[in-house]
């Protein structure tokens, strides 16, 4: 469990969470952005590790991930960068990474590198439930949260899915991949109520949140709001100051 993530939810009335693809549009851009994270309205940041088959990601994020991979960005590239600049970053960083990458890397070695790079949580979209208990136990020993993903279609599996989770619950507010249209508000409200019945963890809503109006609407229902696709879209300009400005407008 990551105390730093828990503390953010205790301190903030509503938590702003963003997402970037590591190494896109360049490793230097990622470095500069992370070193200026304190100048953004974000309270924590998901860092996506480039992967060739990102099943949860829409076209835009998949394309950014593909371009980063093509440019030679690997899991080790990201670890090296974050370990180098970890003292410059005061806000919690969370990896969004696919299980195949962790498995190929070696689970214990991967967790060891996460701790060294000061990673506070992991979101693993393709983690098999059967592997979640062991993964969660190993992460807890290293004060890293395993953040569970639940969707509006999870139904009576929600309790089972969140049972191994820490930090917060990532509630998927759309029926598709990242960037998809959200489900209607009554269904969303009912979905979050179902989550709260089975867990005391804070709930953050993601997928389909594209603009400031969306952000402010979702704040009425959830403890945190997650924006990915729009932020990755900003990074295509390859301008750190522009990206920060647009993020601050998004979360104002």
Regions found by a protein language model. Name each.
Residues 57-65, 229-252:
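C-terminal helical cap(s) of enzyme catalytic domains, especially alpha/beta-barrels
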Residues 16-20, 45-47, 93-97, 122-124, ...:
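Hydrophobic faces of well-ordered beta-strands that scaffold small-molecule active sites
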Residues 70-72, 118-131, 145-153, 158-159, ...:
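Catalytic beta/alpha-barrel core
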Residues 27-37, 153-163, 205, 209-225:
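Catalytic cores of alpha/beta
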């Amino acid at each position: 469990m990551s105390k730093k993530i828990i503390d953010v939810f205790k301190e903030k009335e509503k938590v702003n969470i963003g997402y970037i693809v590591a190494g896109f549009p360049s490793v230097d851009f990622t470095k500069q952005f992370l070193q200026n994270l304190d100048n953004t309205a974000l309270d924590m940041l998901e860092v996506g590790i480039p992967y060739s088959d990102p099943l949860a990601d829409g076209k835009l994020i998949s394309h950014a991930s593909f371009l980063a991979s093509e440019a030679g960005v690997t899991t080790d590239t990201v670890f090296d960068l974050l370990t180098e600049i970890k003292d410059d970053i005061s806000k919690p960083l969370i990896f969004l990474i696919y299980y195949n990458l962790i498995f190929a890397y070696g689970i214990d070695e991967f967790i060891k590198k996460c701790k060294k790079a000061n990673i506070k949580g992991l979101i693993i979209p393709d983690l098999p439930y059967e592997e979640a208990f062991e993964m969660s136990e190993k992460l807890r020993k290293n004060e890293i949260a395993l953040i569970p993903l639940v969707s509006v279609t999870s139904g009576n599996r929600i309790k089972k899915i969140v049972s191994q989770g820490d930090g917060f619950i990532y509630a998927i507010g759309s029926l598709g991949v990242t960037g998809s249209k959200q489900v209607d508000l009554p269904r969303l409200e009912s979905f979050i109520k179902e989550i709260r019945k089975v867990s005391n963890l804070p709930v953050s809503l993601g997928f389909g949140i594209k603009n400031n109006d969306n952000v402010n609407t979702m704040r009425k229902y959830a403890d945190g709001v997650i924006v990915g696709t729009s932020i990755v879209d900003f990074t295509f300009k390859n301008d750190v100051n522009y990206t920060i400005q647009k993020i601050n407008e998004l979360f104002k």
